[in-house]
Amino acid sequence: VMKHAYGETIIKEKPKKIVTLNWNNADSILALGLVPVGTSKMNWGSVTSKGLLPWTEAKFKELGVDNPNVFNDLDGYDYEAIAGANPDIIIAPYSGMEEKEYKRLSEIAPTVPFKDVAWKTTWRDQLLEASEAVGMKDEGEKLVEETENFIKDNVAKYPNLSGKSAALCYIDAAD
């Protein structure tokens, strides 16, 4: 059972066909070594001709998929295309999914939207929620630990960063 902003989603068995919607959610699933049967087109950053961020496309290729199923949901979810992927689960812990969208997507497959506040899920929670939803909680916890250690080890190489913080923003002409 996954608790979230719109209640809870019951996942009866480990999903095999996973759809990821909105930003970055495919990355969590791919990091677990799973391949989404469909994912959202990216609308920020330097995207590839397939509509993915370069590292996302590279991970798809590493996992044997040269032409992933990418949904153009920039103006709203493409429910027909999502249903056409025949998912066992829809994952979107980092999203701005509205309740009416959640209800409609839940008619297609069990859906896991953001837990508390739209677009506020940290990378850690995004990975942990996605890994729990697909029955790989331990693997997700291990990935978080490995990533935190990677960050810590690399920041330690630059002592002048001690006590500093940073903000990253992406702004384009549409903003």
Model segments located where?
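A conserved mid-domain beta-alpha-beta active-site/ligand-binding segment of alpha/beta enzyme cores
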Residues: 167, 174-175
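Short beta-strand->loop
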Residues: 39-41, 91-94, 113-117, 137, ...
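Bacterial Sec-exported substrate-binding components of ABC uptake systems
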Residues: 1-27, 139-169
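Soluble non-cytosolic domains of exported or imported proteins
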Residues: 16-20, 73-77, 96-99, 117-124, ...
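A short, structured surface patch at a secondary-structure boundary
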Residues: 26-78
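Charged, glycine-enriched surface loops/patches
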Residues: 102-138
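Extracytoplasmic/periplasmic mature domains of Sec-exported, cell-envelope-associated bacterial proteins
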Residues: 1-2, 6-9, 15, 20, ...
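Proline-aspartate-enriched helix->loop->beta-strand connector
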Residues: 79-82, 86-92, 110
